[in-house]
């Protein structure tokens, strides 16, 4: 079963790492993990797209999306169980993928505190842990 999950009032600060575990639905086109201060202030929009064999990262400020950063290292696959981490540094995010590959994305909005997490699409999150 897939759907949506939102966590509000989270306390993610620079130096924190979010560990995410879950399963990717069979037949899905992709999923989205958002981190920021709300639905219209996303510091990291992380979007593996299976139909395009790419991972798209972006930021959202109000109604304005930034320039997409595309990563062709797609090590996720539908029907699999995965673990990956997102580390928040003051100026960037480091996403460590299940195979150990790491991608970075700048903290374009410059926030020093993230309170919002959402998961959408074909990903069933079984656990998440925020470590400082």
Swiss-Prot record:
SUPFAM superfamilies membership: Concanavalin A-like lectins/glucanases (SSF49899)
| Domain (Galectin) ranges | 4-131
Please verify whether the record's keywords include Metal-binding. Answer: no
The entry lists its GO molecular-function terms as:
carbohydrate binding; galactoside binding
- UniProt binding sites for a beta-D-galactoside: 65-71
PANTHER family noted in UniProt: GALECTIN (PTHR11346), GALECTIN-2 (PTHR11346:SF104)
- The protein in question is named Galectin-2
Q: Which GO terms describe its cellular component?
A: galectin complex
Role this protein plays: This protein binds beta-galactoside. Its physiological function is not yet known.
Cited PROSITE patterns: GALECTIN
Per the record, what is the consequence of mutating residue 132 to Q?
In a breast cancer sample; somatic mutation
Establish whether keyword Ion transport is in the entry: no
Pfam families to which the protein is assigned, alphabetical: Gal-bind_lectin
Q: Which UniProt keywords apply?
A: Lectin
Whom does it interact with, and what assembly results? Homodimer.
The record's section on InterPro entries has: ConA-like_dom_sf, Galectin-like, Galectin_CRD
Write down the species.
Answer: Homo sapiens (Human)
Output the GO biological process annotations, alphabetical, semicolon-separated. Answer: cell-cell adhesion; positive regulation of apoptotic process; positive regulation of inflammatory response; T cell homeostasis
């Amino acid at each position: 079963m897939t759907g949506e999950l939102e966590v509000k009032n989270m306390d993610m600060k620079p130096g924190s790492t979010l560990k995410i575990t879950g399963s990717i639905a069979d037949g899905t086109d992709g999923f989205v993990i958002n981190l920021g201060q709300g639905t219209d202030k996303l510091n990291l929009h992380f979007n593996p797209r299976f139909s395009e064999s790419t991972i798209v990262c972006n930021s959202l400020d109000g109604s304005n999306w930034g320039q997409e950063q595309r990563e062709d290292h797609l090590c996720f696959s539908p029907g699999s169980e995965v673990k990956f981490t997102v580390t928040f540094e003051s100026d960037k995010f480091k996403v460590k993928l299940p195979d150990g590959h790491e991608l970075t994305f700048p903290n374009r909005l410059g926030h020093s505190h993230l309170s919002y997490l959402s998961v959408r699409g074909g990903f069933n999150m079984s656990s998440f842990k925020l470590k400082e």
